[in-house]
Amino acid sequence: MTKKTSHHKAEQKEKRAGEESGRESEVLDHKIEELENELIGAREQADKLREELLRKAAEFENFRRQKEREALMAGSRTLETVIRELLPFVDDVVRIVEHAPELLEKTEDARPYVDGAELLKKNLVRWLEDKGVTRIDALGKKMDVNLHEAITQVEYPDVEPETVVEVFQDGYVLGDRVLRHTKVVVAK
């Protein structure tokens, strides 16, 4: 082979190598571009998933808080129901204690029963207070339809009209909720 031919072959070989290198470079550039696009897509997908995860976490937290509130409200309603059902018994014990002096005047044998009734009243009142229940103080106050139920009106010349002059039955509140209105007699 001649120098020219071998040089020509070498040039062709170089040219082919350059073309192949160029094609490889093109292929690599194309592959890099594909990978960059995939990366961009993956990042966008990750951002969407992150946002959705944050949204779901917030929804779950709101759901948890709502269930806590509902549980508290259910417990509160149950407590209110129990207390409302207990109030007539409280009234009975209070009446027994109020009439105890009359009973003791008749017979000292009633002393253990009176002492028991007083202890029962004390424990009932303490239990109600521990639960947040308070008796509505009505005597001498202005009639308030939110707290009082007037059962009658009576002439009291020395008392301002609409003033509670007698409590017929005690009323109670639990926090800001009226469990039972105080039944009252009001001055005309």
From Swiss-Prot:
Entries under SUPFAM superfamilies matching the protein: Coiled-coil domain of nucleotide exchange factor GrpE (SSF58014), Head domain of nucleotide exchange factor GrpE (SSF51064)
One GO biological process term: protein folding
Annotated region (Disordered), positions in chain: 1-30
Entry's Gene Ontology molecular function annotations: adenyl-nucleotide exchange factor activity; protein homodimerization activity; protein-folding chaperone binding; unfolded protein binding
Alphabetical keyword list: Chaperone, Cytoplasm, Stress response
An annotated GO cellular component: cytoplasm
PANTHER family: GRPE PROTEIN, GRPE PROTEIN HOMOLOG, MITOCHONDRIAL
Quaternary data: Homodimer.
Full protein name: Protein GrpE
Organism: Chlorobium phaeobacteroides (strain BS1)
